[in-house]
Amino acid sequence: MRVTNQTLWVWRAARTVAALGIALVLAGCSSVKPWINEPLPPEDQSIPVRKSQRDPSILVAVTLSGGGARAAAFGFGVLTEMQETRFVWNGSPTTLLDATDVISGVSGGSIVAAYFAAHGIDGLPRFEHEFLRQNFQNSLITQALRPGNLIDLTSPWLGRTHLLARRLDELYGGLTFGDVERRPRHPQLFITATDMSLGTGFEFTWEQFSLICSDLRKVPLSFAVASSSAVPLLLSPMTLKNYADQCPERRSTSAASARAATGDYRARLYRAHELSYTDAQRKPYIHLVDGGLADNLGVQRLLDRALAGGGLRQTFSEVGIPPRTIRKLVLITVNAERDPSVDINQSDKVPNMVQVVDALLFGTGARATRETQEFLRDITRQWQQSLTAGSPGSTDVFAPDAEIHVIPVNLRDAPDDIARRRLLQVPTAFSITSEEVTDLVEAGGSVLRHSPEFRALVQSLLNTAPHAPPAGLQAKD
């Protein structure tokens, strides 16, 4: 069945290419230009200080990996389970999802991350109907075959991923990052693509866009998600203009930045990549492709930023969190990576193009993910040791009883062996079957519930609650 579906997809893609060739002959070359990012106005060229409406004593961040609709469904299941996790914090009933202050997404994970940031908890159930249960991929192909779009594709400034962005714009209702900022109690949204020239992550954040002197508020969610989902060869890169020469020279004078210049190599590399964006003459444009090529977990840039900022304490203190405030820091990393479709080591035949792309994305990519996960484990131990040792200063943002909970949620940890093997072979596509959606949503909730780290968090929340929390907090069997 999988071969049949893949063959059908390739046939449709070939039909699209053939139709495009006819359009080229009939229409010549189109001059249409797609949306392009805007520069920051002169009066608004400083990074805004974000004021969260959530209780800063508990900070929750969620990262959703790439993997097409498979990752979106698995991540949706995790978010749904987080909403089911109810507890009382500082005398007020809440849920783990409502306490989430940061959501980060890559590729397929960015589709659901952006939807949640835009529509919140009340709008999240609609995502299942509007994306997961729809044949999004077929509608994308149908849209690509429309004569107007075929002619647009003859433009040297417009590629296949722009058609994906148009379809995603319908899903998000034309919303921009500025619209997300105006929604009450919105989480910070991080979407990661890959800078083709650097091979590193490019985040759609205020910090990143300030480097190129561009206004993130005007960026459509659809553009960011399409950039993060632009698988090389199958889809085209997306382009941003660098306006760094229109902003005052950005100088970093903090002691943390000075330490980063001579400290950990990851911090030095992070700062060097930052600096490369400030030269608009050498780098007037940035071309973006699938974020999974640089960081399929969507967590590496968060860690590198903390290192470059001088460490966890310094990073949080610089965003204005008062001393001795943070009691719980929770990071949930969701990984929906699958196995390669074919084990190329089992044959002496030359792998075909589909197998090569598959192996590069899910073989090499899996190795990079394992390295990131190991780095996360190491840095988590360092954070725990730092908390245990305490801070001699009176400006420490962590309370004396502060705890850090890092919770990995991997599709490979699905409890049922048969279901796990089947789900790990679900293709990376914009649409999967309704049965696969149901199983992946259930798997997301199940893996989170059975996670030892999650159970430890639940128990900790029970112990720190001022009075008995609602029954929904109890860890489910």
What are these regions (language model features)?
Residues 2-12, 28-477:
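Catalytic domains of lipid- and phosphate-ester/thioester hydrolases
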